[in-house]
Amino acid sequence: MKKIAFVFSYVPHGVSLGREGLDLLLSVSIMNSKISVFFIGDGIFQLLKNQKPDEILSKNYVLSFKILPFFGIYDFFLCNESLKERGLFKKTDFLLDVSILSAIEIRNKLKNSDLIINF
């Protein structure tokens, strides 16, 4: 099986990329079990707890990220530099058990992927 990396780099609300990425991630997980998910830049907000998208008339799809382990997806990585730039530091701020890596470590992991899909 190919190693597939999904990279989320956009905010969860105001654009549909996050929702589309999550939909594709769930679809691909049925056929492939070597999936890693990376959150860089504003993409780190995809996993942030206690979001209230209904206040901006948006749907709260981010809670759906919590079902990914049931689909055999366990490798979630957040960019440490992105966290610091946005004032987020605690792993407990996020919906999933994540590994926090430097940008260089993320780049090295992405190099080992056969396919990289960015949302």
Swiss-Prot record:
Cellular compartments annotated: Cytoplasm
Pfam families from the UniProt entry: DsrE
Coiled coil regions, renumbered to chain: none
One cellular-component annotation, GO: cytoplasm
GO biological process: tRNA processing
UniProt xrefs under InterPro entries: DsrEFH-like, Sulphur_relay_DsrE/F-like, Sulphur_relay_TusC, Sulphur_relay_TusC/DsrF
UniProt keyword annotations, A-Z: Cytoplasm, tRNA processing
Family classification: Belongs to the DsrF/TusC family.
Summary of the function given for this chain in its UniProt record: Part of a sulfur-relay system required for 2-thiolation of 5-methylaminomethyl-2-thiouridine (mnm(5)s(2)U) at tRNA wobble positions.
Quaternary structure (record): Heterohexamer, formed by a dimer of trimers. The hexameric TusBCD complex contains 2 copies each of TusB, TusC and TusD. The TusBCD complex interacts with TusE.
Listed name of the protein: Protein TusC
Organism of origin: Buchnera aphidicola subsp. Baizongia pistaciae (strain Bp)
